[in-house]
Amino acid sequence: MSKLRVMSLFSGIGAFEAALRNIGVDYELIGFSEIDKYAIKSYCAIHNVSETLNVGDISKAKKDNIPYFDLLTSGFPCPTFSVAGGRDGMEYKCSNCSHEHLITYEDYKKGVKCPKCEAVSKAKDERGTLFFETALLAEEKKPKFVILENVKGLINSGNGQVLRIISETMNNIGYRIDLELLNSKFFNVPQNRERVYIIGIREDLVENEQWVVGQKRNDVLSKGKKRLQEINIKSFNFKWPLQDTVTKRLREILEDFVDEKYYLNEEKTKKLVEQLGTAPLQKQEVREPLMVGHVDLKGHDAIKRVYSPEGLSPTLTTMGGGHREPKIAEKQKEVRAVLTPEREEKRQNGRRFKENGEPAFTVNTIDRHGVAIGEYPKYKIRKLSPLECWRLQAFDDEDFEKAFAAGISNSQLYKQAGNSITVSVLESIFQELIHTYVNKESE
């Protein structure tokens, strides 16, 4: 295989593509599908491609016009499978008797009717059916590899029936599958972010294998796989990356200096700052987000939470203003202008030190100038910046700068980070996929 031909669905800012680039895979982008105009601008700027490659809404695109590709990536919309989104998933509601029911891939292709009265049923949330658009394209083009990504809640959505429908659909269109729950915190970013990844390999390229589910595992993923084994899902064993070491803390991805606009005013943070003054942040080993308190903001508890830079970031969301960005307690440094900093004492008329934040002394040819820097037990509370949120998704600073230069606003930059997939997780997946399966096809 000379170049890996890639088709990207629900592309966002192109995390799959960034991962392929970062590990040096020579690939050709056949096309991408994105409907958010700001995400499209960022995607094209980051990956240096024309908007003409965008097929737009995949549910309306003419799939027979899309050329053949080897790899299909699909981070299909997740809100309908999350707890916050209500988990409507693949549910339809009858327009006549109001009966609610899940649908199958065959129902989706033929047109959905109520199983009780046979009237027309409509999706409770159309985003929950977009997996089927991925399946339609995969069934028509028969790529060698399909990679899906979604929230942890997908596993138990509809009491496990949604995962069953997805797995059976992948089997029925010709793919053996494996799936795993991966947390970004184990992939060199300080973000607690669990996502389910499903890999489908065309059944003529891989032998059927019963899943090896560790006896000691009793998490939601292993329970889900055991349920699928009971209905004889066609599967194989992918060598998933290890998840055993948290290597970064939040403080390691923070900018050295951020604009004052990211800091919350003292009225909203006064109580917490006073508490932190008597109980400073600890520097013990932390493998989880470490909440240090709340600030005085209106709204849901989650937007009031403040975290220590010594721990991890909570899972990024689309944020969308209203103080929804993650917040940290930042220890302040005192910076004071000083004359002749190399001397411990100086007899002179006038002041030798300025107060913290005051302008420096006027430069002349006689005195030497410097700054005295010292930490003192005072904290300020601020939001993470858009760049810091992109770093939490393992995008390069250069990627961020390209999106910023394309005129993308801060609110959209936050949203794009929250909607994306952690690039370093995808890098680990691709390294195994390329080494074991793609290169094998080239031989």
UniProtKB/Swiss-Prot annotation:
Q: Which Pfam families match?
A: DNA_methylase (PF00145)
Reactions catalysed, semicolon-separated, are: a 2'-deoxycytidine in DNA + S-adenosyl-L-methionine = a 5-methyl-2'-deoxycytidine in DNA + S-adenosyl-L-homocysteine + H(+)
Q: Which CDD domains match?
A: Cyt_C5_DNA_methylase
Report the Gene3D superfamilies cross-referenced here. DNA Methylase, subunit A, domain 2 (3.90.120.10), Vaccinia Virus protein VP39 (3.40.50.150)
Q: Where is the SAM-dependent MTase C5-type domain?
A: 4-440
Which E.C. number(s) belong to this protein? 2.1.1.37
| Described purpose of this protein according to its UniProt entry | Modification confers resistance against restriction enzymes that recognize these sequences.
State the similarity comment: Belongs to the class I-like SAM-binding methyltransferase superfamily. C5-methyltransferase family.
Could you tell me what this protein is called? Answer: Orphan methyltransferase M.Phi3TI
Which organism was this protein described from?
Bacillus phage phi3T (Bacteriophage phi-3T)
